[in-house]
Curated annotation (Swiss-Prot):
A divalent metal cation 1 binds at C4, C6, C20, C23. The keyword Acyltransferase does not apply. A divalent metal cation 6 binds at C36, C40, C43, C59. This is Metallothionein-2. Residues 1-28 are annotated as: Beta. The lineage of its organism: Eukaryota, Metazoa, Chordata, Craniata, Vertebrata. InterPro entries: Metalthion_dom_sf (IPR017854), Metalthion_dom_sf_vert (IPR023587), Metalthion_vert (IPR000006), Metalthion_vert_metal_BS (IPR018064). Residues 29-60 are annotated as: Alpha. A divalent metal cation 7 binds at C49, C54, C58, C59. The keyword DNA-binding does not apply. Keywords: Metal-binding, Metal-thiolate cluster. Pfam families: Metallothio. A divalent metal cation 5 binds at C33, C35, C36, C49.
Amino acid sequence: MDPCDCAKTGTCNCGATCKCTNCQCTTCKKSCCSCCPSGCSKCASGCVCKGNSCGSSCCQ
């Protein structure tokens, strides 16, 4: 069962075949999927980006 709960758009699969697309889920571990949008190169530890925006406090 997929433990992720992704918002409206995007897909998240935290199973054996981890895949994340435009994911906004909050339960997905960063080691599995980056929940930052594609425009963000790196997510800060424990950070979850919201929507399609990335704040400086979130991504580095």
